[in-house]
Amino acid sequence: MSSITNGEIREALAQALNAVPGLNIYRFPPEDVNPPCAFIAGFNITPLTFDGNRETKVDVTVVVSHKHVDQIVTLDAMLDSDGPWSVVDAIESATPPGMNFFVESIGGYRELTVADVAYYAADINVTVRT
């Protein structure tokens, strides 16, 4: 079984997100946000897979302003498979020691309320194998 901790996985994902210029990164679901941003939300862990590894499914939520509907364009760019604003590319390009990141699904576009303020948001579901 892997000796890599949940905290190390969270930190490695946060470091991967640093590749996106101007993106505010929250390692935990925040009480307040400054968009554009991404936060690392919940974990679902399979301690021992068929090949003896640990598999952690991580929800990463990306958030943009709700002030103008054209912010959906920014959200789209964050969810594209490549490009300077691609959160997906930042995650898939990361090579932290002892970890492999795989983007499993992207979507769930919605309005998200944080601290009584509405934002546009979507989810990136990441599988981390250690």
Regions found by a protein language model. Give the residues of each.
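Charged, amphipathic alpha-helical segments and their flanking helix caps
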Residues: 1-32, 44-130
